[in-house]
């Protein structure tokens, strides 16, 4: 969404610059002017992006109160309890299909194959930015059309209409591995911890509210209520990634879709 806003702004403000320059300019003049125009376009595009996204982001910084975190537990608690022999955090930023759930399972399976039982490993999956829909129940997916809003596609390129990784009806099949339990609930049973970014929930719920003439606080309240059992709401995804690494988790970026 932010990237698209920047791209549109960049194209809008950069095209006129090239359209009206005399054809007889020297090569040096063209290079200098092109450079100035490019830098000016970047600045203008960045300013336009800031204006376009200011309203929802202001809720995080200008509000007299800290954004609501529905989980009553100390968000630090999960990270302080990490004490496994092998620890890893998967940083998921997009609603990718399969990868955010396959890689944690592969980490556990291959550690088991090399002598470390599941319970002696720690896996944290951080769902942030565009990946937050995986943290919600089907009721929330259906009401807010998450598949369309977050542009979630399955492996066939079809828009997803429900959380396919919450209590899946049948195991997912991974080439070379066969049927593998990749459901969020199944991974939780193996000790995997899922957390979701409250900052992203706040911004995206506000954007949804603006697009549909709803009250942002009402939408956010329903999104809070729709978080899956066992998924911890943390102040932000980047906060969680930082805490995981402070507690000796290796880092793995898992955006592939």
Task: Enumerate the predicted regions with their spans.
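N-terminal secretory signal peptides
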Residues: 1-33
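Histidine-anchored nucleotide/phosphate-binding helix
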Residues: 99-116
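Glycine-rich, aromatic-bearing surface loops/beta-hairpins
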Residues: 209-257
């Amino acid at each position: 969404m932010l990237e698209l806003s920047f791209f549109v702004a960049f194209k809008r403000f950069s095209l006129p610059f090239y359209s009206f320059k005399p054809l007889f300019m020297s090569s040096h003049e063209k290079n200098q002017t092109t450079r100035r125009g490019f830098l000016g376009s970047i600045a203008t595009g960045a300013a336009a992006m800031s204006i376009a996204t200011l309203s929802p982001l202001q809720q995080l910084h200008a509000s007299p109160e800290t954004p609501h975190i529905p989980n009553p537990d100390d968000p630090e608690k999960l990270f302080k309890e990490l004490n496994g022999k092998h620890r890893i955090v998967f940083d998921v930023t997009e609603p990718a299909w399969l990868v955010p759930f396959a890689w944690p399972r592969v980490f556990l399976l291959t550690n088991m194959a090399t002598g470390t039982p599941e319970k002696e490993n720690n896996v944290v999956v951080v769902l942030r930015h565009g990946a937050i829909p995986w943290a919600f129940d089907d009721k929330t997916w259906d009401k807010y059309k998450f598949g369309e809003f977050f542009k979630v596609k399955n492996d066939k390129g079809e828009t997803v209409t429900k959380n396919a990784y919450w209590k899946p009806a049948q195991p997912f099949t991974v080439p070379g591995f066969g049927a593998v339990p990749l459901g969020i609930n199944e991974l939780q049973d193996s000790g995997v911890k899922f957390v979701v970014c409250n900052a992203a929930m706040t911004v995206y719920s506000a954007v949804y509210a603006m697009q549909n003439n709803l009250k942002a606080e009402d939408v956010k309240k329903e999104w809070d209520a729709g978080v899956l059992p066992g998924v911890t709401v943390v102040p932000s995804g980047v906060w969680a990634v930082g805490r995981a690494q402070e507690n000796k988790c290796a880092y793995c970026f898992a955006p592939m879709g």
